């Protein structure tokens, strides 16, 4: 009875964290993808968008993909719980790791591109862009924070997936017949 309650609370915690990661990644993608600013520079109107910096565009696509992945995993968690075999547990672990690495790498790459936009690169004669597109840069900074929070949450989820994988092996290594892995249906 206590083990079943633990599993249900673990599934609820995983579902809550997956929902939070999906919301953070979706918010990062939307904030980044929808932010634009038009300014007049030397009598020429210029529009700053996310497509101007390729690292930001890649971050928007990666964050949107991560949000979709977390929604699919949330549905899996709601309908299957912790049920499923070792193959499903390994697949979830590998996909969680890939999502965590991709989200973290694209967020850090976009942050590096934003540092150039913030400070400029004097050796390359690149001017500071955030002096011109202030609101756009603030929105990008907000999306970077949201993307990093989503990456950290995904890393925590990959640790939970690893625990789920090794729990399958722990149950099968004992000599008495172990009960099958718990599912949400056990409550």
Curated annotation (Swiss-Prot):
UniProt KW Membrane keyword: yes
Signal peptide residues on this chain, from the entry's feature table: none
Ranges in the topological domain labelled Cytoplasmic: 1-14, 76-97, 161-187
GO cellular component: plasma membrane
Keywords: Cell membrane, Membrane, Transmembrane, Transmembrane helix
Keyword set includes Transmembrane: yes
InterPro entries: CASP/CASPL, CASP_dom
Superkingdom classification of source: Eukaryota
Annotated compartments: Cell membrane
Membrane topology: Multi-pass membrane protein
Primary location: membrane
Family classification: Belongs to the Casparian strip membrane proteins (CASP) family.
Subunit structure: Homodimer and heterodimers.
Protein name per UniProt: CASP-like protein 2C1
Organism encoding this protein: Zea mays (Maize)
Lineage: Eukaryota, Viridiplantae, Streptophyta, Embryophyta, Tracheophyta
